[in-house]
Amino acid sequence: MTIEMLYSKIHRATVTDANLNYVGSITIDEELMEEANLLVGQKVDIVNINNGERFSTYVIKGKRGNRDICLNGAAARKVHPGDKIIIIAYANMTPEEAKNFKPAVLIVDDNNDIIEKTTYLQEG
């Protein structure tokens, strides 16, 4: 049996653009992707802090250093530039794996610069 657990998240990212005419996904700065252990095509949940919307999409790589967080396609209707969002990835693991797993958690500022990288400590 496996359970779905938090794998990584980028907390309070600022939406820099919303592109309705793109085929879909979320564009994330390459450096933020690496620090959060996210891969191109990986499924993520998006939680919009401003309006409460919650939806799923997949990751595409943005230009390193631009700090872009852009929602594309239909997801662009659920955000506005300047909105604060949480980007969450999950992974399936056994309960034993979950006891020792430490997800990557990035806290970013208003410019999407990393101000803290941490993990959620788990007992076990």
Curated annotation (Swiss-Prot):
SUPFAM superfamilies, per database record: ADC-like
Organism of this sequence: Nautilia profundicola (strain ATCC BAA-1463 / DSM 18972 / AmH)
Protein family (similarity comment): Belongs to the PanD family.
Role of this protein: Catalyzes the pyruvoyl-dependent decarboxylation of aspartate to produce beta-alanine.
Cofactor annotation remark: Binds 1 pyruvoyl group covalently per subunit.
NCBIfam families hit by this protein: panD
Compartments, as annotated in UniProt: Cytoplasm
Keywords: Autocatalytic cleavage, Cytoplasm, Decarboxylase, Lyase, Pantothenate biosynthesis, Pyruvate, Schiff base, Zymogen
Enzyme Commission number(s) of this protein: 4.1.1.11
Pfam family, one: Asp_decarbox
Pathway the protein acts in: Cofactor biosynthesis; (R)-pantothenate biosynthesis; beta-alanine from L-aspartate: step 1/1
Gene Ontology BP annotations: alanine biosynthetic process; pantothenate biosynthetic process
Name of the molecule in the record: Aspartate 1-decarboxylase
Family annotation (InterPro entries): Asp_de-COase-like_dom_sf, Asp_decarbox
Catalytic activity entry: L-aspartate + H(+) = beta-alanine + CO2
GO-annotated molecular function: aspartate 1-decarboxylase activity
Assembly, per entry: Heterooctamer of four alpha and four beta subunits.
Primary gene name: panD
Residues modified as Pyruvic acid (Ser): S25
Cofactor(s) recorded in Swiss-Prot or TrEMBL: pyruvate
